[in-house]
């Protein structure tokens, strides 16, 4: 429903800021895969959240990309953890999480009642036979996933700051509540 499940933002960075400011309460933990886009740390801190990093592991023999260690992901979750901030395809490594890795993230989110905030700005920039699968499409995940993206990377309009957040109405509503006080409204090309 475009009236309550979509909000347009001034680029994906604003979507990230509004999502974290709108959803994270002081002391909430946010699991984030590192290395990561530099605004993640600043926005988690601005929201009063606590960053719980999980380091992607360097490529092994026969693998071109870094990999998620599922045991480390599970170990990062504590009773204060409320969110997983996901980025796949990943900036800066280029890693595209495998279906098995995505399912592991989904399993952890479902098991611990976590919300997944997924930054998918590189969803159309996938190479070497990899396939981007939105985590929101996995069973049980739409209800707990906020998907963020923009036209900047996918359509080579990096200066045209048009982004969005999509997901269930309660999550999008929280983004909208914070976004209203960041830029009030986003520009339009017309």
How would you describe each model-predicted region?
Residues 18, 38-40, 105:
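Aromatic/hydrophobic pocket-lining residues that form π-stacking "cages" and hydrophobic walls in ligand
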Residues 28, 49, 111-115, 141-143:
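A short helix->loop->beta-strand "cap" motif at the edges of active sites that frequently abuts
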Residues 6, 30-31, 44, 84, ...:
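Generic structural signal for small/hydrophobic residues in well-ordered secondary structure
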Residues 52, 56-128:
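Active-site phosphate-binding strand-loop segment of PLP-dependent enzymes
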Residues 23, 30, 43-44, 109:
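Short hydrophobic alpha-helical segments of the AMP-binding
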Residues 138, 142-190:
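Conserved core segment of the aminotransferase class I/II
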Residues 1-29:
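Phosphate-binding glycine-rich loop
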Residues 46-52:
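A short helix-loop-beta submotif of the ANL/AMP-binding
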